[in-house]
Amino acid sequence: MKSKVPMKNIRNFSIIAHIDHGKSTLADCLIAECNAISNREMTSQVMDTMDIEKERGITIKAQSVRLNYTLKGEDYVLNLIDTPGHVDFSYEVSRSLCSCEGALLVVDATQGVEAQTIANVYIALDNNLEILPVINKIDLPNANVLEVKQDIEDTIGIDCSNANEVSAKARLGIKDLLEKIITTIPAPSGDFNAPLKALIYDSWFDNYLGALALVRIMDGSINTEQEILVMGTGKKHGVLGLYYPNPLKKIPTKSLECGEIGIVSLGLKSVTDIAVGDTLTDAKNPTPKPIEGFMPAKPFVFAGLYPIETDRFEDLREALLKLQLNDCALNFEPESSVALGFGFRVGFLGLLHMEVIKERLEREFGLNLIATAPTVVYEVHLTDNSIKYVQNPSELPPENHIACIKEPFVRATIITPSEFLGNLMQLLNNKRGIQEKMEYLNQSRVMLTYSLPSNEIVMDFYDKLKSCTKGYASFDYEPIENREAHLVKLDVRVAGDVVDALSIIIDKNKAYEKGRALVETMKELIPRQLFEVAIQASVGNKIIARETIKSVGKNVTAKCYGGDITRKRKLLEKQKEGKKRMKAIGKVELPQEAFLAILKID
């Protein structure tokens, strides 16, 4: 079978950039220049298909598009794979880069290299990708192209003397960039005559076609009459359809060949049947070994999600299952809370992932949700020499059964203007950080490497980092190991009852300070009741902080005009008895703000 476009004329490349460096806008420019979408259909951020992506100006789901371009009379196929830039979605980046031969490293001419860019460049270098530096936003008055080129050379060690200078917004330098992609990025390699070997680097659910796999054909070819073996599951399926990717519509094709990127429909009901990183091969003539080196995405942060309307528990399950069809990193299991009823313990890649999922559940499925404080997974060594992994504070065994607790640590890389160095180091010390390295990239920018406990960064670290550096610092992290720590469970009691959804695992030295701040905040948030309410913070059985909400008093003596004082006293005693009884059996409704307050407290 003859290839439609010779393999030497195919270029597979992705775009690496930090949030807000103009990656999606540059992708739009390349699409427009290659006429992949008509002017009428062209919208800004055409590669970002979710509303939430456009509103937040971020890319979450990696998209792909096939572009046709003619250079010097020869036809080329350019497969552009758009990748997310946020630290939470780095698993999307790693799988996308596995299917490319080259990457455009897009850096904002006004901001220079950021921490997330460095992390993604290292993934690209590990995959032996050809990296093309691209300086974007050169038309801005405060652009400093020479300094940024020097910055890239000093930080990453890539020669930038011939770096492309573009402005995606003003469409400057786009033709030159396309020519550079064709002349510099190598063509894919692979054996056209070998058995089919295709890497699944993304999958999603389509309402009409079921689960779809976005694949890169490494060896061989695939056609619509073939039977396919999914190597991870060992199951065989017929091919229902093959398509080329395009943001607005899928373009049908009869076959996909070595070096190409395309969409495969096998008529499956769930993306779990075609896991990302799995290998597709020919059922009759399978490839001997699957493609190596893929790790399934592991949740980093866990939180409880509970519907405010308790009868919508099943709706929440359905909604999570639907989101899971598109998001293999999302996992969940049912749990119950005395305070909140039935809900789910959900695993996320990070805080942005958690926010996005919660917002999508509320927006797309009309659910009202309460999210509990995010936690990480703790390794608890018990006195009987067994090990228990705890992701929910309520599962922590009693203190006398625990030999030691180990918590996960991450290695954080932070790039900051040097004027904010003092503030930043103070923040990192408050978060129990241990400095590993400090490096001046130039006179005005510093790169810090710290090891930090994971539970210190899942709360509010990102917001604090941005506020203490006026938004200029950038941050990236990678998990390293579990280390022993002095941790305790901090409980909040309202009217004598432990509110399990407000429990947190915290460093022993911070427990008093956090407990005091918590009860003071709760006092402001819980409405006054007809009886007195005690709010207490406790570690084990020891109360470490307390606040009292005074009761609302009804004037029961208002109807007594003059007369005997004993009549008034009798009414007041009766009221006192009633309040006592209320206090014994009364339940306090906690507002949603009380659960959110725990996230905001230092």
From Swiss-Prot:
Taking every annotated instance into account, which residue ranges of this chain make up the domain tr-type G?
8-189
The UniProt entry, under Gene3D superfamilies, shows:
3.30.70.240, Elongation factor 4, C-terminal domain, Elongation Factor G (Translational Gtpase), domain 3, P-loop containing nucleotide triphosphate hydrolases, Translation factors
GO biological process entries:
positive regulation of translation
Membrane topology, as annotated, equals: Peripheral membrane protein
Q: Which locations, inside or outside the cell, does it occupy?
A: Cell inner membrane
Question: At which positions is GTP bound?
Answer: 20-25, 136-139
Q: Name one Pfam family in it.
A: EFG_C
Task: Report the InterPro entries cross-referenced here.
Answer: EF-4, EFG_III/V, EFG_V-like, EFTu-like_2, G_TR_CS, LepA_C_sf, LepA_CTD, LepA_IV
Domain of life per record: Bacteria
Give yes or no: UniProt keyword Ion transport.
no
Question: Catalysed reaction per UniProt?
Answer: GTP + H2O = GDP + phosphate + H(+)
Keyword annotations: Cell inner membrane, Cell membrane, GTP-binding, Hydrolase, Membrane, Nucleotide-binding, Protein biosynthesis
User: Which family, according to the similarity comment?
Assistant: Belongs to the TRAFAC class translation factor GTPase superfamily. Classic translation factor GTPase family. LepA subfamily.
Free-text function comment from the UniProt entry? Required for accurate and efficient protein synthesis under certain stress conditions. May act as a fidelity factor of the translation reaction, by catalyzing a one-codon backward translocation of tRNAs on improperly translocated ribosomes. Back-translocation proceeds from a post-translocation (POST) complex to a pre-translocation (PRE) complex, thus giving elongation factor G a second chance to translocate the tRNAs correctly. Binds to ribosomes in a GTP-dependent manner.
What NCBIfam families does the record tag this protein with? lepA, small_GTP
Q: PANTHER family attached here?
A: TRANSLATION FACTOR GUF1 HOMOLOG, CHLOROPLASTIC, TRANSLATION FACTOR GUF1-RELATED
**Protein name (Swiss-Prot/TrEMBL):** Elongation factor 4
Please name the source species. Helicobacter pylori (strain Shi470)
